[in-house]
Amino acid sequence: MTQLAIIGATASGKSDLAIKIAKKIDAYILSIDSLSIYKEIDIVSAKPSKKELEDIKHFGIDFLHVDDYFSVDIFINLYKEVLQICKEQKKNLIIVGGTSFYLKSLIEGLSAIPKISKEQELHVEIKLKNLQQCYDFLYSLDREYMKNISAKDSYRIEKALLLHVGSSLTPSEWFRQNPPIPVIKNIDIFNIDVSRDILRERILNRTKKMLDLGLIDEVCHLEKKYTRLPHAMNSIGIVETLEYIDGFISKDEMIEKISTHTAQLAKRQQTFNRTQFDTIRSAPLEKLEDIILSTLA
C-alpha cells in the first residue's frame, strides 16, 4: 500500500490533482481541510462536487456537524481508521488539503493525555469562566510553556489546565515525560508551487464563484441553525458574509475582504509548507502530476 500527501495553498488546485492521481493509482482520499470536515459548510469550504465525491471515496469530508467538538487527536484517530480500511480493501491513500498542520501532527505525533474524570472536567469548566485568572495561574506555574500562548486563547488554556488537573504536573513536565510518538514514519509529500499573482487571481475568481453558488444563503442557513458561537463560524468567508448580512459592508466590499483574507491565509500556508517539513517536493501544478506518477512508478 502506498501513501502520499499533496499540499498547497488554498485555491492552488490540490483537490483536482488528488482526484486525477487517485483514479490512476486506485486510491482513496483523506482530506486535511479544517472546514470541509463539517457538514453543511459546502460553498465556503469549496468541497469537491457530489460527482467527484462519488467517483473517488473521500474521508474527512462531511464528518462532523458545525457545532461538534474537533481536535487534532480526533483527526489522528480518523486517519488510523482510514488506513485500516485502505489496507483491508487494498487501496492506496492520498492525503490532501490546505491544513498542513494535520499532516505535521501525523508525522510528529501527539503526546498522550492524562485521563480526566467528569468531576475534573466540571472543575476546569467552572474555572474557565474567569479565563484571565486561569491564564495567570498557569503562567505562574509554567512560564516557559505559557509564554507562547495568548491570554485569550481559551482552547489552549483549557488544554493546559486539564493537563495540570489530570496529572498534577506542569504542561512542560507532562510533555517531557510523555514525548510524542509519530503516526506516519515515511510519506512522500508534494507541494503545489504557485506564484502569488496567479494565486490572488484564482482566489478572487473562486470568491465570485462562491457568491454565484449561493454563499449568502449558505451562511444564513448556518447562522440560523447553529448561531455564531461554534468555532467554525469564525472562518474566512463566513465572518465577512455575516458582516454583509448585518449591513456593515457592501457586497463588493464583502468580496474584496474575503479575497484579501484568503490571500493572507494562502501566504501563511505557503510559509508553513516551506518551513515545517524536512523533505518536500515542490513544483507547478502542471508538472506535479508527472512528478508524482514517476515517483510511484
UniProtKB/Swiss-Prot annotation:
Enzyme class: transferase
One Gene Ontology biological process: tRNA modification
Interaction with substrate tRNA (site feature) positions: 99
Residues annotated as binding ATP: 8-15
Catalytic activity: adenosine(37) in tRNA + dimethylallyl diphosphate = N(6)-dimethylallyladenosine(37) in tRNA + diphosphate
UniProt GO MF annotations: ATP binding; tRNA dimethylallyltransferase activity
Gene3D superfamilies according to UniProt: Crystal structure of tRNA isopentenylpyrophosphate transferase (bh2366) domain, P-loop containing nucleotide triphosphate hydrolases
Cofactors named for this entry: Mg(2+)
Binding site for substrate: 10-15
InterPro entries to which the protein is assigned, alphabetical: Dimethylallyltransferase, IPT, P-loop_NTPase
Keywords: ATP-binding, Magnesium, Nucleotide-binding, Transferase, tRNA processing
Interaction with substrate tRNA: annotated span: 33-36
Keyword Disulfide bond: no
Quaternary data: Monomer.
Entry's family note: Belongs to the IPP transferase family.
Biological role stated in the UniProt entry: Catalyzes the transfer of a dimethylallyl group onto the adenine at position 37 in tRNAs that read codons beginning with uridine, leading to the formation of N6-(dimethylallyl)adenosine (i(6)A).
Protein name: tRNA dimethylallyltransferase
